[in-house]
Amino acid sequence: MKAKLLILLCALSATDADTICIGYHANNSTDTVDTVLEKNVTVTHSVNLLEDSHNGKLCRLKGIAPLQLGKCNIAGWILGNPECESLLSKRSWSYIAETPNSENGTCYPGDFADYEELREQLSSVSSFERFEIFPKERSWPNHNINIGVTAACSHAGKSSFYKNLLWLTEKDGSYPNLNKSYVNKKEKEVLVLWGVHHPSNIENQKTLYRKENAYVSVVSSNYNRRFTPEIAERPKVRGQAGRMNYYWTLLEPGDTIIFEANGNLIAPWYAFALSRGLGSGIITSNASMDECDTKCQTPQGAINSSLPFQNIHPFTIGECPKYVRSTKLRMVTGLRNIPSIQSRGLFGAIAGFIEGGWAGMIDGWYGYHHQNEQGSGYAADQKSTQNAINGITNKVNSVIEKMNTQFTAVGKEFNKLEKRMENLNKKVDDGFLDIWTYNAELLVLLENERTLDFHDSNVKNLYEKVKNQLRNNAKEIGNGCFEFYHKCNNECMESVKNGTYDYPKYSEESKLNREKIDGVKLESMGVYQILAIYSTVASSLVLLVSLGAISFWMCSNGSLQCRICI
């Protein structure tokens, strides 16, 4: 009996067996990502794909300053409003910046025909040559070129007029018919502007042009219009009851434009040979100009980012990330951080048997922890880690490259009569924006799910690699660990890690130790059975003795009577 109890104590006493465990890296990162199946998964490493910051300034685009219109708008700049005279010297720009409520446009009241189309054309122009299409001093010898000024276009307290147009009036009591032509020899498109004056009454008409009925004709290969002045009383605007309507056309290289009139012509003085640039555009912004450079400009401010998406503004100029409505687009590159992997993912095997990551393993994503008589330590599996890093890096770069289509996205121009078209365009743009946002978010969710499952699969494969080497020379004890049936020094541990473990070398020792452990288990079973029988018999005897004592006491004091009948 003593021998059996000794065996039991030996079996119950703890022994420090050599062990090796498979695990994964963990750190103090608080980065969270979303996947198809989960929200806010804490991971060791991740990359942000969404730019949400800007500097709040207008900057040079690729080293080229923008054309900042200040208090002028496109009409005031291109017609030559006297208050916009400082802009006349500008010849090139990266983009055009206009304030939302610019004061100086058409100073003499009237309509600007196809103004939105002109803005659209100028949005793709990065430079122009301003030149005299009809030199002022020699083009109009039979007409007055000096008295055509107005208080509506005053400058520095004096009446003035547009710097790119001439208001032709009668000279010496007559307004002879005029016929002027220009041939475009610039090898570029030429923007030509002119106007037609509509007096408020017949007296003004006769005073200025010496005739009641007048016309203006403008003809080119692609343009053919005849204008008749509309003489009528109108409410005064900027002190003027008359009106001027403004017109423009683009003259192709080699084409000719002909002006014919017998009154009311606001003649071209300067025209513009246009040079287009793909990166140009017009933005409406209250941001101030600053000494800074950028590759991407928005109305809110400049973006300096190589990320594929941004949520700052849908209108951009330059090499800009794609606008989406998302608030978070973060792609995982590392592993799940502690706590452990628990649920099965969408695409691969799950290393759900490992309860937590190792903060002590800092030189890799997956690896080993061993313990033997020589000590303990962590070691990363460099091959599987490097393969994972290469695969994930290539995937992230591929996603960014595919989605990072840098481009300019400027607003389309619509006039007041095209409100329904503008609303329809907004709905279409919103639809595309929703699709882009959905695609971007779904892409990130799917890739995050795949990456996390990829890591889980790698840990599982590493575990199976060790298990297949050790076979029955060790036993699985849970949490990704194996307990050896033999002594495994550091050299032995290293062979397990690098895949050169010599199974036959340790199989005999393992077999003997395994049989001893199995024998101890059998002896322990016998001891447990003996103890159980002994305990049962002893308990029964104690119970019988107790009952007998109680019965004797009760009989002696008369509480219990016993009768024996024969």
UniProtKB/Swiss-Prot annotation:
PTM remark: Palmitoylated.
Keywords, alphabetical: Clathrin- and caveolin-independent endocytosis of virus by host, Clathrin-mediated endocytosis of virus by host, Disulfide bond, Fusion of virus membrane with host endosomal membrane, Fusion of virus membrane with host membrane, Glycoprotein, Hemagglutinin, Host cell membrane, Host membrane, Host-virus interaction, Lipoprotein, Membrane, Palmitate, Signal, Transmembrane, Transmembrane helix, Viral attachment to host cell, Viral envelope protein, Viral penetration into host cytoplasm, Virion, Virus endocytosis by host, Virus entry into host cell
Extracellular-side segments: 18-529
Gene3D superfamilies attached to this UniProt entry: 3.90.20.10, 3.90.209.20, Hemagglutinin Chain A, Domain 2 (2.10.77.10)
Lipid-binding residues (covalent, S-palmitoyl cysteine): C555, C562, C565
Signal peptide (residue range): 1-17
Name of the protein in its database record: Hemagglutinin
Domain of life, source organism: Viruses
UniProt cross-references to Pfam families, sorted A to Z: Hemagglutinin
InterPro entries, per the entry: Capsid_hemagglutn, Hemagglutn_HA1_a/b_dom_sf, Hemagglutn_influenz_A, Hemagglutn_influenz_A/B
Subunit: Homotrimer of disulfide-linked HA1-HA2. Interacts with human CACNA1C.
Upper lineage: Viruses, Riboviria, Orthornavirae, Negarnaviricota, Polyploviricotina
Ranges in the topological domain labelled Cytoplasmic: 551-566
Glycosylation (residues): N27, N28, N40, N104, N179, N286, N304, N498
Gene Ontology terms for molecular function: host cell surface receptor binding
Additional detail: Major glycoprotein, comprises over 80% of the envelope proteins present in virus particle.
Transmembrane segments: 530-550
Cell location: Virion membrane; Host apical cell membrane
Family: Belongs to the influenza viruses hemagglutinin family.
Protein species of origin: Influenza A virus (strain A/Hickox/1940 H1N1)
Disulfide pattern: C21-C481, C59-C292, C72-C84, C107-C153, C296-C320, C488-C492
Function, as annotated: Binds to sialic acid-containing receptors on the cell surface, bringing about the attachment of the virus particle to the cell. This attachment induces virion internalization either through clathrin-dependent endocytosis or through clathrin- and caveolin-independent pathway. Plays a major role in the determination of host range restriction and virulence. Class I viral fusion protein. Responsible for penetration of the virus into the cell cytoplasm by mediating the fusion of the membrane of the endocytosed virus particle with the endosomal membrane.
SUPFAM superfamilies, alphabetized: Influenza hemagglutinin (stalk), Viral protein domain
